[in-house]
């Protein structure tokens, strides 16, 4: 959530930044006018209340003097009626301002490339060289079916489109991957957490999914509960409405969880395979940091995600997202895109973002600065470390052999009971 004071005092700069995220200047101008109206009404209310207090004192004095108070009582009633009417108007204005501040996206950092969409993203670096095959590489969905480890047909029968069963070494591979990821993040100082997979609406508001993106979630009908779209939600809200000790920052959390997404607006995109599912496992990283340290922490978090891909020897590239492609809560985002041979393309496998104080303001996560004793909003960061299903897809395609088998990456073999190959 944006700071209304920042919008008020630095309006032109904020408007210019938000315009790069598709926010119409007319929206901000309307917000500015409503905010000015609110402040004028507040002045009127305080003036009227002061007058009412004066009249009340005069009534008390008149009663002590046994004087007639009818006129003064009538005047006080009129003042009270005016205050009541203005309070009602203020409530409407506050609701409108809340709607503005909770639905406007975060302000992009100066280092974020300006652009309309993903075509304007900027590649930062690459790692590894895509493998050259001496045979036609298969898509991971075909490999998975041929190996008997992925079953979309029965997933569709039991649930519906974009669901599947992992079987045998497929299930073992999925488990090996997320255990490996959690172990690697643990070495980097992350505390492993098992979170609830259901959260309340306040938690969804805290991280920015609500109210704007309700259509992307699975709500439990007639309840205050939602299936988590990412472990970012429970991990970040762990400290909601709390004040942390500044000397304890930064704090690192990691968790593996299922993620549930309706994929509204994704009709026709990635209809086959593991790239876009309604339910998938993901290992998440979340950080709580002091403002002056958050961008250094973003670079470290991105490196933590890269470490997984490097140890799995999967070629990838790092991309800085443009202002038009970043997520709602982010002020800066790096995407990691892994090479998918059958698509001859890099596909997103991780997204690492600094939200600065955007989520912390919504969730009221603060810290007491040990330097001056003041309570301040901290910065929150989140990143995938990694999306597990997409990692399975990348391994199946990059490690496939001409006979249809798939070699298991060396880093995962200790987690696979020593198995080296998945054979048809």
Curated annotation (Swiss-Prot):
Extract one GO molecular function annotation from the record. Answer: catalytic activity, acting on a protein
Q: Which residues bind ATP?
A: 261-263, 348-351
Q: What class of enzyme is it?
A: ligase
Q: Which reaction does it catalyse?
A: tRNA(Ser) + L-serine + ATP = L-seryl-tRNA(Ser) + AMP + diphosphate + H(+); tRNA(Sec) + L-serine + ATP = L-seryl-tRNA(Sec) + AMP + diphosphate + H(+)
| Protein's pathway | Aminoacyl-tRNA biosynthesis; selenocysteinyl-tRNA(Sec) biosynthesis; L-seryl-tRNA(Sec) from L-serine and tRNA(Sec): step 1/1
Q: Do you know which SUPFAM superfamilies this protein is assigned to?
A: Class II aaRS and biotin synthetases, tRNA-binding arm
Q: Where in the cell is it found?
A: Cytoplasm
Q: Which GO terms describe its biological process?
A: selenocysteine biosynthetic process; seryl-tRNA aminoacylation
InterPro entries reported in the protein's UniProt record: aa-tRNA-synt_IIb, aa-tRNA-synth_II, aa-tRNA-synth_II/BPL/LPL, Ser-tRNA-ligase_type_1, Ser-tRNA-synth_1_N, SerRS_1_N_sf, SerRS_core, tRNA-bd_arm
Show the GO cellular component annotation of the record: cytoplasm
* Key word Transcription regulation present: no
List its EC numbers: 6.1.1.11
Q: Highest taxon of the source?
A: Bacteria
The primary location reported for this protein is cytoplasm
Residues binding L-serine: 230-232, 284, 384
PROSITE patterns for the chain: AA_TRNA_LIGASE_II
| UniProt keyword annotations, A-Z | Aminoacyl-tRNA synthetase, ATP-binding, Cytoplasm, Ligase, Nucleotide-binding, Protein biosynthesis
Known Pfam families for this protein?
A: Seryl_tRNA_N, tRNA-synt_2b
Can you state the subunit structure given in the record? Homodimer. The tRNA molecule binds across the dimer.
The family line of this record is:
Belongs to the class-II aminoacyl-tRNA synthetase family. Type-1 seryl-tRNA synthetase subfamily.
What's in the domain note? Consists of two distinct domains, a catalytic core and a N-terminal extension that is involved in tRNA binding.
Described function? Catalyzes the attachment of serine to tRNA(Ser). Is also able to aminoacylate tRNA(Sec) with serine, to form the misacylated tRNA L-seryl-tRNA(Sec), which will be further converted into selenocysteinyl-tRNA(Sec).
Its recorded name reads Serine--tRNA ligase
Please report the organism this UniProt entry assigns to the protein: Streptococcus pneumoniae serotype 2 (strain D39 / NCTC 7466)
Name of the encoding gene? serS
